[in-house]
Amino acid sequence: MAGMTSAGNQHLIRTDLWSRQIKELLLDDLNAMKFVRMISDFPDGQRINSPSIGEAEVADFNENMAIKYNALDTGNFQFNFDAYKYSANAISEKFKRDSYYASDVIAAFPQREHRALMVAVETDILAKANAGQTASNLNTINGGNHRFVGSGTGASITLNDFARARYSLTKAQVPLNNLVAIVDPSVAFTLGTQANLVNLMTPNPQWQSMVRDGNTTGFKFMFNIMGFDIYISNYLPLVGSETINSVSVTNGVANYFFSASPGDTMPWIGGFRQMPTVYSEFNKDLQQTEHLTIAEWGFKLYRPENMVTILTSTNAAA
């Protein structure tokens, strides 16, 4: 007489087994805020004004000549709190009763919503640098070009582009310490496969204090070339097609080169009108618990002289 077998007792066998652990998404690091001069001295209003004073002039003096008194040039830098964003989710009472994973889902709401807002912040900061320059223009400052297309084959990056970025920052009187390059993964691929660059790569960050102090902690550091600590970001703005000084790029991305010297030298300025704030409440009419994270912020390119944008094609890694 046959005993119990799997074939004859399928109704007693669990065909599908469910893991207690929920598969998490792989998340990259968000650190653009490290390069922002954050301000907080605003009790009310939507627009921040920051006055500036120009340089004094020097003139030749001759005897019996009246001195000419000049006024210093002045300016006013403005930026607005232009982003008011939220992330919201809800979970029904029935789902709480029915789902084995209900507690895990509820616990994930605040951190996932906060993460979503910070991705929006990261994207906004990086986009503001590109928006702060004039497209299809060299954006020349003191004779140095602050926006140009990569000089390599197919608008890829080359060692010459690093030298040009350093030259432009020097002409703009930017401190050449704490130099940082934030590049697209396609640029990292190009750099890692160019024989003439591999020998110039330093495997450790040159600006050790930046890593120690947290200025660039979290970015995926690659190597150092010509004084630039190179980091990779997936959130750099795409520029599509653009022609600068008769050189064109298609499927372009904006890569940034600048000095991360702390204080007033930082290339970006910005602040939060409302820090990410979490709200939760039960909606008795819909029989669901609602979770909301909301924030208001504004960012802008603060020092155009401390920003060199090199446009490269993402096709370089294809």
Tell what function each PLM region has.
Residues 4, 115-156, 249-253:
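Signature of extracytoplasmic/envelope-associated structural regions
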Residues 44, 175-177, 226:
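Short, well-ordered loop/turn elements at secondary-structure boundaries
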Residues 73-77, 104-106, 114-116, 205-210, ...:
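Glycine-rich loops and low-complexity Gly/Arg-rich segments
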Residues 57-61, 190, 240:
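Short, solvent-exposed loop/turn elements at domain surfaces
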Residues 50, 76-138, 170-185, 230, ...:
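Long, contiguous amphipathic alpha-helices that act as assembly "spine/axial" helices in icosahedral shell
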Residues 44-78:
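N-terminal low-complexity, intrinsically disordered segments
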Residues 2-33, 39-42, 50-55, 80, ...:
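Sequence/fold signature of self-assembling virion shell proteins
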Residues 135-213:
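Extended, solvent-exposed, turn-rich assembly/linker loops in the middle of proteins
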